[in-house]
């Protein structure tokens, strides 16, 4: 349909993979031209229009970059982190050895490299380690040019193929790199805000309100930071994040973390009048103490991406309706679609002292719950030093009273939210009970043994247990053998057999409806229609000799023997 940027691009592509390069200039030129070939003519027109440039070799001003990325006011650190990241990526594939400023070509490469699908197409490989590239871009500092060693200068004469250049990461050794924890905290906070502000590639951005909540999002970002490095519990400035920590956490328990960054970068391909208003559904959670925009953003990093576009429905809020099984049952049991149970409280650090001196009800609970011995527990620093504890349970089935049996399908999962993030998936159906004869609520437990004069909880190896008064809860993790597997993060780190137990005093319990399949399908169709409409409005009739033709010539896309991007 559209004009090709190269008459014989397919032939050149085949021969270029065997082509060898000996100097940086040719390498950069090759990847710059290839980047332009990856985008459509309408995308290129919008890209140039947003940046107000005609030539892709034009350096992008700091002001234009900041305006396009909608950085928060008075947050110089995140501006520095992201602009440095983009400068590193703009010099791809010579991230370490090239110090060119960010040009139109460079920014095009940034957009492609930060988009998972576009990156695979751009580099012609699905196995490329995009997380390693991102980590390098966040680690390297492009302030002062390093003095090249004699060995590096001699390497300039080496012949390298495209594959060698791509997979070599410019000889950057990620084992020698790390990101300061305070830098990573700022970056994670910004990504969580983008989750709310930029849910799609074509949504209008008006982030003043969410930027005012930077502190709230920072709390959730701290949970993600401790997921990467559980030792970050005190002085953040004294800690750092390694590539192994960064990669492991994102791959296992926050696979959607970078999607909002993809969405933001795609905005360069839409002019302002092509953007659409998007309802982020935050009005329904404005009265919640727990289900805040920040917590919802954190949840969306690990749960299926469809969750965030669900119309969340407040079903039960303990602070309003009362902390009782009866109130929860009355509010929740008519809901016939998926739901999320959220519980938050303060960890009881000295059980015996608390039971003896402060809360006789807890002493009674300990008589019914078989507590792990302190000497048998192996908690990491985040669990030992942080008392705030929050869990969510995703439940696909409708709730029901189960005094003898269980409910819950294979999509049920427990998500640890604070002090770090981990995800515990079920390995069988029927893992939840709602016991109205004194047994409370259990996920991953066996039904309690209830007799006229006694009661005994039977916690599973991985389980979350609520007492019948919704005053106390216990999360147990002792490894394999139960109806839930150990956490994805724990298994990846080979820590699944490190037993621990979190007893906490419940402060909040809430249940939120996620919407049924029909509503979800309608919302997805609406989003797809909106994006298609934006693309349709974006299309320019290349045969027109009117204003559209003039715009293309001004942008240097047609006329004067110019080609363009692909269609």
Swiss-Prot record:
Using the UniProt record, give the first listed, main subcellular location: cytoplasm
Keywords linked to the UniProt accession:
Cytoplasm
Task: Report the GO terms under cellular component.
Answer: cytoplasm; fungal-type vacuole membrane; nucleus
Taxonomically, the superkingdom here is: Eukaryota
Q: Where in the cell is it found?
A: Cytoplasm
Q: What are the residue boundaries of the TLDc domain, all occurrences included?
A: 289-515
GO BP, sorted A to Z: protein-containing complex disassembly; response to oxidative stress
Please give the family membership noted in the entry: Belongs to the RTC5 family.
What's the further remark here?
Answer: Present with 2600 molecules/cell in log phase SD medium.
What is its biological role? May be involved in a process influencing telomere capping.
Protein name as annotated? Restriction of telomere capping protein 5
The scientific name of the source species is: Saccharomyces cerevisiae (strain ATCC 204508 / S288c)
Q: Which gene carries the instructions for this protein?
A: RTC5
